[in-house]
Structures are given as structure tokens and as C-alpha cells.
């Protein structure tokens, strides 16, 4: 887009990805969406991932173990995003150490550009890594 970063502002967001929110169910009570960590930590966006989680639940509402497994598969990259964001927050980020996860995050975002509503460029993600 040709713009430049003037300043960055941040607000606290809950960083708990689905892999850190188990169990997703207890008896007949089932967690869905943001209650089980379906927030994309890099953007703080949770509405669309939560609606996707509802679809996963509806497909598996008669088998909670299958639901848990499907959620784990669908949101697998979220753990990598969590690790990336946490390392940046704690000033413990090493690009070389994070490279495999960084590439996975880029591929995921590139594949889902329509969902994110933006063109994903490696150069822009690199700016985030360097910030």
C-alpha cells in the first residue's frame, strides 16, 4: 500500500489458543468459539474464527471427542501464532528459531486472504517480526 508505520498501539487480548483451553466440554456443557481460544492472536480477531468453530461444533455435536479433534486440526496454526506473539511480547523472539512457524503462519494467512480481507505479503509480515 506504500504507507509507513507512524506508531503502534496495543491493547491486552486473551492469549489462550484452543490447544491451551482443554477440555472443551464437561458433561453437556460445551465450549465453542472465543470461550475455547479461537482468537487469531496476531490480529486479535475472533468473530469469524468463532463462527467457523460453531460450524465445526454443528458437524460434531453428537460426538464431543470428534469435535475436540476437529477443532485441534482446524486451529493448529493458532498455537504457532500464539508462540510468535508471546515471544514478541516477552522480547524473546528469534527469527531463526521461529522461521518454521513464521512460514506456517504466512502460508496460512496467504491461503486465507479472502477471510482476512487483505493481501498478505511476506514483507508486511516481516515488518511485524521486526517490530
Listing of model-derived features with the role each one plays in the protein:
Residues 1-62, 66:
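FAD/FMN-dependent oxidoreductases across multiple families
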Residues 59-131:
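C-terminal helical "tail/cap" subdomain of flavin- and related membrane-associated enzymes
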Amino acid at each position: 500500500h506504500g504507507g509507513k508505520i507512524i506508531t503502534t498501539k496495543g491493547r491486552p487480548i486473551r492469549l489462550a489458543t484452543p490447544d491451551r483451553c482443554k477440555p472443551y466440554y464437561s458433561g453437556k456443557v460445551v465450549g465453542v468459539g472465543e470461550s475455547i481460544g479461537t482468537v487469531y492472536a496476531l490480529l486479535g480477531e475472533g468473530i469469524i474464527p468463532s463462527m467457523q468453530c460453531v460450524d465445526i461444533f454443528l458437524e460434531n455435536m453428537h460426538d464431543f471427542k470428534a469435535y475436540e479433534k476437529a477443532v485441534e486440526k482446524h486451529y493448529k496454526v493458532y498455537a504457532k501464532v500464539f508462540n510468535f506473539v508471546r515471544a514478541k511480547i516477552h522480547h524473546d523472539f528469534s527469527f531463526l528459531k521461529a522461521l518454521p512457524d513464521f512460514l506456517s503462519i504466512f502460508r496460512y494467512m496467504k491461503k486465507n486472504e479472502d477471510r482476512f480481507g487483505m493481501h498478505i505479503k511476506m514483507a508486511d509480515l516481516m515488518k511485524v517480526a521486526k517490530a
